[in-house]
Amino acid sequence: MACILCVASLFLSLTKFSIGQREVKIQEGPLYRAEGYPVSIRCTVSGHQGPSTQDFRWSIYLPSAPTKEVQIISTKDAGFSYAVYAQRVQSKEIYIERLQGDSVLLHISKLQMKDAGEYECHTPNTDGKYFGSYSAKTNLTVVPDTLSATMPSQTLSKKEGEPLELTCETTKATVQHTHLSLTWYLMQEGGGSQATEIVSLSKDFVLTPGSSYADRFVAGDVRLDKLGATSFRLSVGKLQPSDQGQVFCEATEWIQDPDETWTLITRKQTDQTALRIQPAARDFTVSITASSSPDEGKPLELVCLAVGRDGNPQLQGVWFLNGKEIAQTDAGGVLDLKRDYRDRASQGQLQVSKLSAQTFSLKIFSVGPEDVGTYSCEVAEVARTQMGSWQVLQRKQSPGYRVQLREPAARSVTVSAEQRTVWEGETLTLLCKAAGDVSALSVSWWLTPQDQSTPVFVAGMGQDGTVQLGVSSPGPAHRGNRRLEKVDWATFRLEIASAMVTDSGTYECRVSERLQNQAKGLQSTQKISVTVKSLKSSLRVNLMSRQPQVMLAHTFHLSCVVRANYSDLKLPFSVTWQFQPAGSGAFHRLIRIAHNGTVEWGDVLSQIHRKTKVSQSFFRSQLQIYDAAMEETGVYRCTVEVYDRDSICTSGPARVSATSNLLMITVTFPESKLSVNSSSQVQELSISSSTQIECAILSRSAGNLPLSIIWYFSSVSANASYLKILEMDQSSVVKYGDEFQTPRSKQKFYSEKVSQDLFLLNILSVEDSDQGHYHCAVEEWLLSTNDTWQKLERKTSGLTELKLRPTGSQVHVSKVNWTGNATEYGEAGFSCSLDGSGSTASLYSVTWYRGRGTATATAAAVANATATITAPAGSQMLVHLQYDGLLQYGREGSRRLQHCYRSSPTDFVLKLHRVEMEDAGIYWCRVTEWQQHGHPGKWINQASGESQRMVLRVLRSEPTVSSLICSSGPLLHFLIVCPFVMLLLLATSFLCLYRKARKLSQLSLSAKKEKALWVGMRKTSLQKEAGEESGHY
């Protein structure tokens, strides 16, 4: 039993292991990063099922709300971010980098203080069930950027070899434990934005020199010392020219994360110090010496020596001949020869080398006339910069050394030519003859081209008869055209078959002989100038035609005339005729007559070879095209290629080519005489009848060219367009238009040719829908030789209007005379009746009119688009009651007409409400009968009739007070305005009286007060007098 339990436990463990448990891991915190700098947080998921690429969601819990989730960014949902982070996510300041399907990095490019908090990485469940962890958290603390690096901005001028000391001050106030690293850089002038590292102190306090300063650091010439806690000093014992540039230091602050990795959190650079270094003086002198006397044919070695410079200077030398640079050797021994001397060095004729650090050599193995002149050398001291290039410190020039050959007495030589001026492609023959006694001679021919100053070896023959051709000849094919032969012991002939323009120049024949008992032989030279004229320089091609405008089906001629000054050479040539169709931008080949007689046709005009004749004579080609077609309108030109005389046998390429001027050929139609009857007519028919419409041709072009007849129709409805009924083309094939393709339309309309000048359109069983305008279009066609039709002219006939004649019986309207009176503002009524009950298959419409002195007649549309109701001249349509009960009013009808109705199928009533004086006049009605015809049924106007005129008189009503007032505008205005004016005057009067009464009241009160005072005084006086009197008694 225990064994079974163990097995079960093991099975469950394996099952759990195979299924796996999801686990999300995030970079361990807390993490400390500085404000303004980036941060990257890693998150991975393992043990998951589902797709290999998992989605990640990042959120933050801020210290101010530690339980509130703020969504930042997601790999799945673009709208996951909260508004506070959405803008930074959209601007890519915050983004997710996927390392693998199950691993990502959250990047924040520029941290803000508000970014501090607890970050959560969450992975949505893709497993069959929830098992494991789906999120992980870490803390991020954003600390202020307190790092600073300072160094005064200054410009220092130093001499080479002097010491240099620069100090960089750094401070930081980060609360957490951090390390500093510091690096000194040099930014050289012209080095772009790339700085060179001098020396650095790592965060682990390890000194490391830059690659360019490793040797000097090991030697102790470059040092980095830490002075106290914040100062770092760069010391250079002996400055070198390569140290010139901008010097600065960079401080970097590092912090160790919980996973024990060091991460950069801040970095600062100081201002730059401009360092100018004056190279030390290194004076030396340069001299030039020769190893032997400069005899012709002998070797010559020139040595350039720099003297007076101690140490191991880096020197480069430059050789000059007559002030022109010929060779240069740099400090590393790399040789650079100019083009003329590069060829001689490759042939082993000279050698330039650097014998030692201060010695340069120029060796010429066989001195010739071209080596005569003044030689000098220039030595420059250089130093390699940090970028690897050479910097020149100083230059010194040697005195000139004159090289002049001592020529031995030589025999005379004469050079002649059969023709000193030949055409390109002709044979150039030169003879070189030496005078004197018979001797074994060798000869070499040299050519100095017209645009060069250095001779080029053409051919040579040794004393044993061995011929050597120049290696500088332009290609093996051209070398085969050169031949050098010996006519006799003293005469040598150079023959250049099929000469080229590049063969022009000055030819020099050098005759050499070896003297007995002498190491060097004698050489005699002579020159001759030869010109090879270009064939293209005088080649002219003209294209001419007497008929730039050609009538259709006529013949035109083109002549390609070649003009050249070498026509007597009778060189073979080919002619290519080209054609650019009208409206095209490219030329196409019509025909090419090769110089060997081969004819090649183009494919632009398929029938051109059937009607073209080409004749060619010496320097002239003629093209004759019969039966011109319209597609042959365009621009023509011819191209001429001139070949060598023997090119037929050798199949060589053309020497030159030239293209003629452009010539426009226009193929025009012959003048057409087509004329068609353009008069218009009207046909009035009964419904279901048949008719014919004529298309008469008055005149035609000569030859009775084929015609095509096209019939068109336009209905009477507004804005109706013309529709094609049928077309009988120039081959008498009839085609119906798109709207007339039905079998019924093809039976109803058909064309008939009565004669050469008369065509008919037959219309059977005319219906209401057939009403409208008909005309024909006549096209005259011309058949070209390539079996294509060309339209010559198109004419259009006049219009034929087709109307339906009313077919019903006459409508009899009651003719009873009626004269009536109506009171103004009262009502009036009119009646209109038919005599009889009318047809049961008919419906009736009525139109009411009123006669008026000079009123303009108006028209109103009725039942359908093909019928109109027109008011008689001098009358006005008031209202129209259609057969289907719809009402249409005239211009004034809708203003007062209130009621128009049908009292019975054949009785009609018109009532006027609130009659006015201007309504007096003559009234009458017109009744129209309508019947339904065809399938589907359409209502057709059958007949109409008018009633007797009815006279209406309008009597004025007796005036009342209110009517008088309302009828008089001034009185009405007076009655409205006058009360307001009276009220205003009354109010003004009351106000004045009130103010006056108040003033009088005040005056009265004052008078009373004065009177009372006077009365009191009077009483006192009287009492006093009475007392006195009583005293007397």
UniProtKB/Swiss-Prot annotation:
Keywords assigned by UniProt, alphabetized: Disulfide bond, Glycoprotein, Immunoglobulin domain, Membrane, Repeat, Signal, Transmembrane, Transmembrane helix
Subcellular location: Membrane
One Gene Ontology CC term in the entry: membrane
Domain of life: Eukaryota
Membrane topology: Single-pass type I membrane protein
Ig-like C2-type domain segment(s): 22-141, 144-266, 279-388, 408-529, 539-657, 670-797, 806-941
GO terms (BP aspect): positive regulation of myeloid leukocyte differentiation
TM stretches of this protein: 971-991
Signal peptide coordinates: 1-20
Glycosylation sites (chain numbering): N139, N677
Outcome when changing D451N: In strain: NOD/MrkTac
CDD domains xrefs: IgV
Coiled-coil ranges from the UniProt annotation: none
InterPro entries referenced in this protein's UniProt entry, alphabetically: Ig-like_dom, Ig-like_dom_sf, Ig-like_fold, Ig_sub, Ig_sub2, Ig_V-set, IgSF_V-set/TM_domain, Immunoglobulin_dom
PTM per Swiss-Prot/TrEMBL: N-glycosylated.
Side of membrane Cytoplasmic, spans: 992-1033
Positions of disulphide bridges: C43-C121, C168-C249, C304-C377, C432-C509, C560-C638, C695-C776, C832-C925
Keyword Transmembrane helix: yes
Extracellular topological domain: 21-970
Ranges spanned by the short sequence motif EWI motif, renumbered to the chain: 253-255
Substitution effect: I648M: In strain: NOD/MrkTac
PANTHER family membership: IMMUNOGLOBULIN SUPERFAMILY MEMBER 2, V-SET AND TRANSMEMBRANE DOMAIN-CONTAINING PROTEIN
Function field: Plays a role as inhibitor of T-cells proliferation induced by CD3. Inhibits expression of IL2RA on activated T-cells and secretion of IL2. Inhibits tyrosine kinases that are required for IL2 production and cellular proliferation. Inhibits phospholipase C-gamma-1/PLCG1 phosphorylation and subsequent CD3-induced changes in intracellular free calcium. Prevents nuclear translocation of nuclear factor of activated T-cell to the nucleus. Plays a role in the inhibition of T-cell proliferation via IL10 secretion by cutaneous dendritic cells.
Protein name as annotated: Immunoglobulin superfamily member 2
Species of the source: Mus musculus (Mouse)
